[in-house]
C-alpha cells in the first residue's frame, strides 16, 4: 500500500505542469547570478560593513524565498488572476501614489522606494510590472474584437497606461516606464493590434516624446551627452561606463578568472547592481558572457513556446508578457553596460542585487 502511494506521488510529480527546461534555466541563471553577486559585491560589502558576504547572504536568502514561493504559486491556476485583472490597474495606481506619500523615501536623488520599517522596504515599480501584465492580459482578451482598429484598439488601450507612466515619471523612473511600455506593446501586437499602428504612433508621438523627456530633464540630457562620448567626462558622468568598458576589454576570451576582477575594487560604483554584467565579462570573458546570454535565450524561447501552447488567450498573453519583461531588461542592461545606449539604471534579471526584486522575478 505504501509502495503504491509512493508510485502515485512520483507519478503526480512527473505530471506536474512544470516546464522543466524553463525551471532548470532559471535555477542556472540564479546560481550563476549568486556567484557573481558574491564576487562583485565583496569589496564594497567589506568596506561598508566589514563583512564581504553581506550582499551575497541577503541575495541568497531572497533567492531561496523566491524558489519556495515559486513552488507554491505554480500550484495556482493562472485563470484565477483573470477574475481580478481590473483590480490590478487600481492596485498599480495606489502603489505608485504611495511612493509620493510620507512612506516614500528618496534614494540617490530619486523617490522610488516605500519604507515600511528600516528593514522592510520595496520598489512598487517591480510589482507594478507584473500587475500591468495581468491587467492587459485580461483587458485584451475582453476587447479582442476591437484590437485591429486604431482608435478603439491602439489608442483606447494605450490610454490606460498613461496614469501609470505619469506616476513613474514623477519618481522619476524612466527605465521602468520604458520596460512597461515595451511589455504592453508586445502584448498588444501579439493580441491582434496592427504593427503599422504602433509604427506610425511611435514615429509621431513616441520618439518626439522621448526626446522631450530627455531634453527637459538636465540629468537625462547629461547622460545622453555622456553616452555620445563618455571619455569627454571620464572623471565625472562618464566614469562608470568607461570603467565598465575597461572591465569588458580586459576580460578577453576566457576572462581573468572568477573572483579576480580589478574593476570591482571600487572603480565601478556598486558593481553588484546595474553593471554586474561587466564584472562577469571581466572575470569569465566572452565565453562566460555567451553562456549567460544563451541561457537567457533559452528562457525566452521556452516562454514563447509556453505562450504558443497556452490553452487560452489569457494564458498566452501572461506568458508573453513575463517573457517580454525579462527580454527587455536583459537587452537594455547589456546595451548600457557595453555603452550601446545611455545609462538608465536597468538591472540584469537574476543577477543584479535586488532583495525583494529577486523574489518577484522568480515567482
What name fits each language-model region?
Residues 173-178, 256-261, 271-273, 286, ...:
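Transmembrane helix boundary and interhelical junction motifs in multipass membrane proteins
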Residues 118-128, 170-172, 252-257, 346-358:
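Glycine/serine-rich anion-binding loops at beta->alpha junctions
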Residues 2-10, 331-363:
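A juxtamembrane structural motif centered on a specific transmembrane helix
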Residues 226, 230-273, 277, 287-288:
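TM-adjacent membrane-interface loops and short helices in multi-pass inner/ER membrane proteins
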Residues 10-26:
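N-terminal membrane topogenic signal
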Residues 39-42, 261, 352:
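Short linear Ser/Thr-Pro motifs
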Residues 24-31, 35, 39, 48-240, ...:
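Hydrophobic alpha-helical transmembrane segments of multi-pass inner membrane proteins, especially
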Amino acid at each position: 500500500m505504501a509502495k503504491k502511494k509512493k508510485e502515485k506521488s512520483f507519478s503526480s510529480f512527473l505530471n506536474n505542469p512544470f516546464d522543466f527546461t524553463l525551471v532548470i534555466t532559471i535555477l542556472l541563471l540564479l546560481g550563476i547570478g549568486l556567484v557573481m553577486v558574491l564576487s562583485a559585491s565583496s569589496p564594497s560589502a567589506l568596506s561598508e560593513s566589514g563583512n564581504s558576504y553581506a550582499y551575497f547572504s541577503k541575495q541568497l536568502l531572497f533567492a531561496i524565498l523566491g524558489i519556495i514561493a515559486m513552488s507554491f504559486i505554480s500550484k495556482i491556476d493562472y485563470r484565477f488572476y483573470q477574475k481580478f485583472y481590473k483590480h490590478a490597474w487600481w492596485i498599480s495606481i495606489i502603489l505608485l501614489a504611495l511612493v509620493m506619500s510620507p512612506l516614500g523615501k528618496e534614494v540617490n536623488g530619486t523617490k522610488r522606494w516605500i519604507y515600511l520599517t528600516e528593514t522592510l522596504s520595496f520598489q512598487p515599480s517591480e510589482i507594478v510590472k507584473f500587475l500591468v501584465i495581468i491587467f492587459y492580459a485580461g483587458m485584451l482578451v475582453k476587447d479582442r474584437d476591437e484590437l485591429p482598429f486604431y482608435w478603439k484598439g491602439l489608442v483606447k488601450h494605450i490610454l490606460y497606461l498613461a496614469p501609470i507612466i505619469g506616476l513613474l515619471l514623477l519618481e522619476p523612473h524612466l527605465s521602468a516606464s520604458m520596460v512597461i511600455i515595451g511589455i504592453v506593446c508586445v502584448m498588444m501586437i501579439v493580441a491582434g493590434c496592427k504593427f503599422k499602428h504602433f509604427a506610425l504612433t511611435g514615429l509621431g508621438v513616441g520618439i518626439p516624446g522621448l526626446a522631450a523627456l530627455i531634453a527637459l530633464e538636465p540629468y537625462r540630457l547629461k547622460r545622453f551627452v555622456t553616452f555620445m562620448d563618455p571619455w569627454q567626462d571620464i572623471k565625472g558622468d562618464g566614469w562608470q561606463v568607461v570603467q565598465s568598458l575597461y572591465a569588458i576589454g580586459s576580460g578577453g576570451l576566457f576572462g581573468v578568472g572568477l573572483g579576480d576582477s580589478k574593476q570591482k575594487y571600487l572603480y565601478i560604483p556598486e558593481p553588484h547592481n546595474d553593471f554586474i554584467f561587466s564584472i562577469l565579462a571581466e572575470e569569465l570573458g566572452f565565453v562566460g558572457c555567451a553562456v549567460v546570454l544563451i541561457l537567457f535565450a533559452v528562457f525566452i524561447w521556452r516562454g514563447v513556446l509556453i505562450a504558443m501552447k497556452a490553452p487560452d488567450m489569457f494564458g498566452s498573453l501572461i506568458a508573453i508578457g513575463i517573457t517580454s519583461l525579462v527580454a527587455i531588461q536583459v537587452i537594455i542592461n547589456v546595451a548600457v553596460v557595453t555603452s550601446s545606449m545611455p545609462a538608465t539604471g536597468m538591472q540584469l534579471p537574476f543577477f543584479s542585487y535586488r532583495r525583494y526584486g529577486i523574489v518577484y522575478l522568480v515567482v
